[in-house]
Amino acid sequence: MQSYADTTLPAMGEGAEMTTAEERRLGEDIAREIFRDPQFLEDPILYEYVNSIWQELMAAARQRGTLTAELQERFAWQVMLIQDATVNAFALPGGFMGVQTGLVAVVTSRDELASVLAHEMSHITQRHIARMLAQQKRMSPVMIAGMILGALAASKNPAAAQALMIGGSAAVIQTQLNFSRDMEREADRTGMGLMQPAGYSQAGFVSMFEKLQQANRMNDNGSWPYLRSHPLTTERIADMQSRLPNNAARQPQDTGMVAQMMSARAKILSKPEPTVLQQWAQWVQTPEFAQQTAEQRSGALYLAAMANHQLGRTAPAQAALDQLDTLVQAKPQAVRQAQLLRADLALTARTPDAALTALAAVVPTAQKSFASQTTTISSATTGLVSEAVISRGADNSLSISDADRDAPLLPPAQPAASTKGQAQDRTQLILLAQALAQLPTAQLAQQSSLLRSASNGLQTVVAQTPKDAAAWQALSSIFRVQGQPLRAIRAEAEARAAQYDYAAAVDRLRAGQDMARHSKERNDYYEASIIDTRLREMQALAKEQAARK
């Protein structure tokens, strides 16, 4: 195990050599490369689960004062999922957070996952990254970005890391990027303080530490890189144990069905070997399965359904889904996840009718969105929408019809925090868009109501969270099936911009300009004017980004 070197922390003021704006730009450059990586995972179901924990911890950090209003505004606070079986999570400059599927796969409760995210969030709120990078005084931002990307690659593939490293060996650079013991202790204590206000048990911190310690005792085969960047010490573990409330006996945690189901999903998304899939598919038929708790059985059935589906075994997959439905029927959130799984597997099998049926059974919040033909947003969002297309209702709220709605002209620096209901709507809307895009053209005319609802709902999502690339991409697919190619192109451009690929955004906007010149549609005039404005903005951002290379 790589040891830590004791270092003296610079005073907070000394970290000012890297301003919040500089750190944000550095983070964006790193995030852009991660978004381009084939291992970047766009899975709305797992993302909703991880991001919901992240948002609850952010709310707790604001409440406790560890996340200031300035830092919340200036940093991105974006979670990125990485499709990798190794157990890792990492905070990046500028408020970006990477979570690998291997980590979600090994935790057994929301509390354990929250403990890791709270720790990493505290590295960000305490400006540990800026303070650490301030010590690399002779290095340019490009070199620092290369160091960080190289260190991330080293956790997965040392050979690939060498191609990214700048200015030294992988081992030396990894040492430079590790947080000091004092920083780790501060992140532990600050992170643990977020748990209870966010609705999580502080015992999750200790159980996660014990899980990491157990892995640390074993011969490390490289599957737990989190241990190398965050080495455990007896002192750290004892400190966390001593901070548990006296009245909090070490009782078995209520792991919860949803946590088990999301752990199962992460296992499948980590791309296991076919032999492993076969073991998971068959385990629900063993006597040991019947002896598990209801929570554990829900995860095993979810796992078996996905494993059988990937192995092409339709009947066993359906049987596992049916068993899962029976098991979770008294747990509303677990019922919702079971229906989302049905929709997801139907989409993978390219049976959109089955996906639509499953989505129609999902509901609480999203049904209202699907049923409405007009979306009303508060006057607080007026600056995000083109003045030319807004009409005011009698109650002075802003109502934007499907025919005239336009997306943000000037997206804010970071996405607004979504409520739980809005996050759930997002998941269902993205899956709905995928299902509608798979329908044969002849069937689309029968789904005009759903198309309008999906369009309205997704436009609300991107108005609230302009950096949501997946929502923009889903909206683009809806615009295409609605016969609005110009709007589809602009939504594609916004998706690229949301992933900080401004050059690609410029390319799509230019294509939109060319299309607009040849269009005779009246409504395209408004869209063309927005494209012109966004193109100028993207060109400026692309130029600035290129200058940093």
Where do the language-model regions lie?
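Hydrophobic or amphipathic, alpha-helical segments that drive membrane association/targeting
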Residues: 1-90, 173, 215-217, 314-328, ...
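Extracytoplasmic and endomembrane cell-envelope/extracellular-matrix remodeling and assembly machinery
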Residues: 12-14, 28, 40, 48, ...
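Active-site His/Glu-centered metal-binding helix of metallohydrolases
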Residues: 30, 117-126, 190
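Acidic/histidine metal-binding catalytic segments
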Residues: 46, 133-145, 160-163, 199-209
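TPR/TPR-like alpha-solenoid repeats
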Residues: 97, 106, 124, 247, ...
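Short pre-active-site segment immediately N-terminal to the catalytic Zn-binding motif
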Residues: 98-115
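Catalytic Zn2+-binding segment of zinc metalloproteases
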Residues: 108-112, 121-138
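Membrane-active amphipathic alpha-helices enriched in small hydrophobic residues
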Residues: 141-156, 163-172
